[in-house]
C-alpha cells in the first residue's frame, strides 16, 4: 500500500515534529489532500497524500519527531469516512467503547474528565496554534473553554490565563500533573515548567552552534540620523501617494546601504563550506520579524534590483505573513545577509548573533537625541543611533568589518547618495 513520507522541505531542514493529524485512521483521503501538519524550526507545513484512498495507519503520533523521507502514514483502498469531524460524530458506539476501555484502567474522576474533554476536542475544531493544542493536551485543558485574546486563535498564554482562573475544577485537574513534576529543589518557591516548542528548541540549538562554530566578533559605530529623518519627513506623504499607500520607513535605507556596503566588501556576503569559501553574487537580505512564536527571518530577494518602494512593500508583506503564520519555506532560506532592529523594543545597543550560513549581521537600535560635538566650538542635540556588525572573524578581518560599518554610516548620513545608487 502507498506510504506517505515526510517530504523534502529545504536544504537546512532535516526533521520536523508532527503538530496535528488532520485525518483519523479510517478517514477518506483525496489525492493532494493534507493529512497532517508538520512543525519545523522555520514554518509549519501541511503534508499531503499523493494517492486517494483511506488512511489505513498512522506510523507516528502527534509530538513525535520525524525525519525527511521517513514513512509516517499508509494509504489503503476504499472510501472510508467522510472527514475527521464526521468520523467522530457518525461512530458514537466506537467512542463509547473507547471511553469504557479507558475507564477500566482507572477510577480517577480527573482522568475520566480529561478523556471526555479529548473527545469534545475531536468533535469540534478549535482555531488554535499547534503548540497551544499540544500544551492543552499535556495539561488536560478543554480548548472549547478557552477564550482567545486575539484574532480568535487560541494561544498558550490564553490557556495559562484559563488555568489561573479561580475554579475548583481546574485546581483538581492540575493537582496530579504537579505531583509528577520533578522540580522540588526549592519546594517553597513557585515555578512553572513547560516543554519547549520544536521551534524554540531548534533555535536554541542553532544559536549554540553559531556560538561554538564561528569566531564571532562585534564592532560598533554611531549614525547621525538627522538627514535621513528630514528626508523621510519631506517625502513620506508623496511617497505614499506615488506607491499605493506604501510607507517610507528606515529599513529601506538600511537595506540599500547594506547592499552598497556588501558590493564594496564582498567577503561580508560569504560563508564557509568545508574548506571552501563561497562568496554570494546575489543580495537577499533577511529582515528579523518578531512574532508570538519567536523571531523569524524572512528574506527580501534581489535587493540590488529593487527600489525603495518595492523593498518597503515586501518587508511589510513578509511581516504580515510572519505574524499570520503564512510564511513559506521559500521565504526563509538561502539568504546572504541579515538586518535586525532591536530599536523597536527600546534597545540602545546589542551584539546580534549571526544567522546560519552567513558571515555577518547588522544590528539597528533606538534613535536617541543626545548632545554631539559638531566641531571644537559647537555642540548640538542630534538624533543618534548605535549600529553593530557581528561577523565571523574566520572570513572577515577587522579592517573590513570596520570599513563595512563605516560605509553604512556614511550612506545613512548622506541619504541622497543612496538615492543616486538606486
UniProtKB/Swiss-Prot annotation:
**Which metal ions or organic cofactors does this protein require, according to UniProt?**
(R)-lipoate
| Coiled coil region boundaries | none
| Positions of the Lipoyl-binding domain | 1-76
- For whether the record's keyword set contains Acyltransferase, the answer is yes
Q: Which residues form the Peripheral subunit-binding (PSBD) domain?
A: 127-163
E.C. number, please?
2.3.1.61
Segments carrying the region annotation (Disordered) are 77-184
Listed A to Z, the keywords are: Acyltransferase, Lipoyl, Transferase, Tricarboxylic acid cycle
Sequence positions bearing N6-lipoyllysine: 42
- Basic and acidic residues bias located where? 152-163
List where Low complexity composition bias occurs: 164-176
Any note on cofactor binding? Binds 1 lipoyl cofactor covalently.
Q: How does it assemble?
A: Forms a 24-polypeptide structural core with octahedral symmetry. Part of the 2-oxoglutarate dehydrogenase (OGDH) complex composed of E1 (2-oxoglutarate dehydrogenase), E2 (dihydrolipoamide succinyltransferase) and E3 (dihydrolipoamide dehydrogenase); the complex contains multiple copies of the three enzymatic components (E1, E2 and E3).
The similarity comment for this entry is: Belongs to the 2-oxoacid dehydrogenase family.
Q: What is this protein called?
A: Dihydrolipoyllysine-residue succinyltransferase component of 2-oxoglutarate dehydrogenase complex
Q: Supply the source organism for this entry.
A: Staphylococcus aureus (strain N315)
Its organism's taxonomic lineage begins at: Bacteria, Bacillati, Bacillota, Bacilli, Bacillales
Amino acid at each position: 500500500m502507498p506510504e506517505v513520507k515526510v517530504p523534502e522541505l529545504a536544504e537546512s531542514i532535516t526533521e520536523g515534529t508532527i503538530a496535528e493529524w488532520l485525518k483519523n485512521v479510517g478517514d477518506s483521503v483525496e489525492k493532494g489532500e493534507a493529512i497532517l501538519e508538520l512543525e519545523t524550526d522555520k514554518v509549519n507545513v501541511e503534508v499531503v497524500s499523493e494517492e486517494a484512498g483511506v488512511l489505513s495507519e498512522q506510523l507516528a503520533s502527534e509530538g513525535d519527531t520525524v525525519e525527511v523521507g521517513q514513512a509516517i502514514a499508509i494509504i489503503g483502498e476504499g472510501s472510508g469516512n467522510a472527514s475527521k469531524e464526521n468520523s467522530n460524530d457518525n461512530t458514537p458506539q466506537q467512542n463509547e467503547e473507547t471511553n469504557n476501555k479507558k475507564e477500566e484502567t482507572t477510577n480517577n474522576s480527573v482522568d475520566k474528565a480529561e478523556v471526555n474533554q479529548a473527545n469534545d476536542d475531536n468533535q469540534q475544531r478549535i482555531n488554535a496554534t499547534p503548540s497551544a493544542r499540544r500544551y492543552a493536551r499535556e495539561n488536560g485543558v478543554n480548548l472549547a473553554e478557552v477564550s482567545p485574546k486575539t484574532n480568535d486563535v487560541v494561544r498558550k498564554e490564553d490557556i495559562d490565563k484559563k488555568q489561573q482562573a479561580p475554579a475548583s475544577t481546574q485546581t483538581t485537574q492540575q493537582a496530579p500533573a504537579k505531583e509528577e513534576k520533578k522540580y522540588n529543589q526549592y519546594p517553597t518557591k513557585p515555578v512553572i515548567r513547560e516543554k519547549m516548542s520544536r521551534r524554540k528548541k531548534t533555535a536554541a540549538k542553532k544559536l549554540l552552534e553559531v556560538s561554538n562554530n564561528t569566531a564571532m566578533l562585534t564592532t560598533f559605530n554611531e549614525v547621525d540620523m538627522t538627514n535621513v529623518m528630514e528626508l523621510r519627513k519631506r517625502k513620506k506623504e508623496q511617497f505614499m501617494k506615488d506607491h499605493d499607500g506604501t510607507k517610507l520607513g528606515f529599513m529601506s535605507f538600511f537595506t540599500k546601504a547594506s547592499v552598497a556596503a556588501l558590493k564594496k566588501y564582498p567577503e561580508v556576503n560569504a560563508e564557509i563550506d568545508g574548506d571552501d569559501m563561497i562568496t554570494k553574487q546575489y543580495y537577499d537580505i533577511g529582515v528579523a520579524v518578531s512574532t508570538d512564536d519567536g523571531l523569524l527571518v524572512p528574506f527580501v530577494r534581489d535587493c540590488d534590483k529593487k527600489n525603495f518602494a518595492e523593498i518597503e512593500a515586501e518587508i511589510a508583506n513578509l511581516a504580515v505573513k510572519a505574524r499570520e503564520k503564512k510564511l513559506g519555506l521559500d521565504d526563509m532560506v538561502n539568504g546572504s545577509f541579515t538586518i535586525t532592529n532591536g530599536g523597536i523594543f527600546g534597545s540602545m545597543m546589542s551584539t546580534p548573533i549571526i544567522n546560519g550560513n552567513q558571515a555577518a549581521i547588522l544590528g539597528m537600535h533606538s534613535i536617541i537625541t543626545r548632545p554631539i560635538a559638531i566641531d571644537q566650538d559647537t555642540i548640538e542635540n542630534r538624533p543618534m543611533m548605535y549600529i553593530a556588525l557581528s561577523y565571523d572573524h574566520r572570513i572577515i578581518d577587522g579592517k573590513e568589518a570596520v570599513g563595512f560599518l563605516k560605509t553604512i554610516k556614511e550612506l545613512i548620513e548622506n541619504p541622497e547618495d543612496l538615492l543616486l545608487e538606486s
